[in-house]
Curated annotation (Swiss-Prot):
Its job: Adapter molecule for TNFRSF1A/TNFR1 that specifically associates with the cytoplasmic domain of activated TNFRSF1A/TNFR1 mediating its interaction with FADD. Overexpression of TRADD leads to two major TNF-induced responses, apoptosis and activation of NF-kappa-B. The nuclear form acts as a tumor suppressor by preventing ubiquitination and degradation of isoform p19ARF/ARF of CDKN2A by TRIP12: acts by interacting with TRIP12, leading to disrupt interaction between TRIP12 and isoform p19ARF/ARF of CDKN2A.
Predominant cellular place of this UniProt entry's protein: nucleus
Matches recorded under Gene3D superfamilies: Death Domain, Fas, TRADD, N-terminal domain
Domain called Death: residue spans: 179-289
Keyword Transferase set for record: no
Name this protein carries in UniProt: Tumor necrosis factor receptor type 1-associated DEATH domain protein
Post-translational modification: (Microbial infection) Glycosylated at Arg-235 by enteropathogenic E.coli protein NleB1, C.rodentium protein NleB and S.typhimurium proteins Ssek1 and Ssek3: arginine GlcNAcylation prevents homotypic/heterotypic death domain interactions and assembly of the oligomeric TNFRSF1A/TNFR1 complex, thereby disrupting TNF signaling.
Entry's free-text remark on domains: Requires the intact death domain to associate with TNFRSF1A/TNFR1.
Keywords: Apoptosis, Cytoplasm, Cytoskeleton, Glycoprotein, Nucleus
SMART domains linked to this entry: DEATH (SM00005)
């Protein structure tokens, strides 16, 4: 890979930052879904990451996933030194402090205590923070699997419009003195961003898809086609489902070894549905499949393939 202007392009890696509020009254996934809070939450994340890791040239958000009650931020690192700086800020608590400060201001709370987790692939980096070299190796091994999400570009445009609108009213002391106050008054004065898909839909390959709880047919389709990758999908689902966290997957593999891969995969989703109830949705499964390069299985679940193997 060719070096960029600052030599950062030679070193590129990816990680996932899990952010969850410890306050029952603050659910970050809900706040990010709210049209009038979304820009403020994005701005808070962006500001905290810039403070702890550097400019978007070296630390970029690729996508923000909602996984009730968490937000999962996919990060792209360009450059070993900026990544090391981010890891030190994470280890020393500077990133947590910056996020808590920014999110409290964005959501009009006195404080928003946070629980954070950092993962690179299957590695939970929180347990490895004392070994920075190993953390860097884990992040480097996870090459970004996507370009920046279009939704984040739209939020960036909305934020830029918001800043321009505030600058044009620089004589208004109330606006200028509280740039991180709840965005409702400011957003009403500027052109809002394009509305997100309704809460009951999600985007798949750029198209809105109706979200719903997983059905028995979904579980059967998944179990029939996923094969050996059921454990990888389980690793993705376990981030937002405590019932699937270690050693649950190993237990499933052992308990249903005689029955084979179909039963192991079926029982994985059965446990997911039992634990999450109506929150065990099609969207969460499809995102886990996409993360593990199982797009064709996602298309089967969504009914987007015809019997001849082409797109419906």
């Amino acid at each position: 890979m060719a070096a960029g202007q600052n030599g950062h392009e030679e070193w590129v890696g990816s990680a996932y930052l899990f952010v969850e509020s410890s306050l029952d009254k603050v659910v970050l996934s809900d706040a990010y879904a709210h049209p009038q809070q979304k820009v403020a939450v994005y701005r808070a994340l962006q500001a905290a990451l810039a403070e702890s890791g550097g400019s978007p040239d070296v630390l970029q958000m690729l996508k923000i996933h909602r996984s009730d009650p968490q937000l999962i931020v996919q990060l792209r690192f360009c450059g070993r030194q900026p990544c090391g700086r981010f890891l030190r800020a994470y280890r020393e608590g500077a990133l947590r402090a910056a996020l808590q400060r920014s999110l409290a201001a964005a959501l009009a709370q006195h404080s928003v205590p946070l629980q954070l987790e950092l993962r690179a692939g299957a590695e939970r980096l929180d347990a490895l923070l004392a070994d920075e070299e190993r953390c860097l190796s884990c992040i480097l091994a996870q090459q970004p699997d996507r370009l920046r999400d279009e939704e984040l570009a739209e939020l960036e445009d909305a934020l830029r419009n918001l800043k321009c609108g505030s600058g044009a009213r620089g004589g208004d002391g109330e606006v200028a003195s509280a740039p991180l106050q709840p965005p409702v008054p400011s957003l009403s004065e500027v052109k809002p961003p394009p509305p997100p898909p309704p809460a009951q839909t999600f985007l798949f390959q750029g198209q809105p898809v109706v979200n719903r709880p997983l059905s028995l047919k979904d579980q059967q389709t998944f179990a029939r086609s996923v094969g050996l990758k059921w454990r990888k999908v389980g690793r993705s689902l376990q981030r937002g489902c405590r019932a699937l966290r270690d050693p649950a997957l190993d237990s499933l593999a052992y308990e249903y070894e005689r029955e084979g891969l179909y039963e192991q995969a079926f029982q994985l989703l059965r446990r997911f549905v039992q634990a999450e109830g109506r929150r065990a949705t099609l969207q969460r499964l499809v995102e886990a499949l996409e993360e593990n390069e199982l797009t064709s299985l996602a298309e089967d679940l969504l009914g987007l393939t015809d019997p001849n193997g082409g797109l419906a």
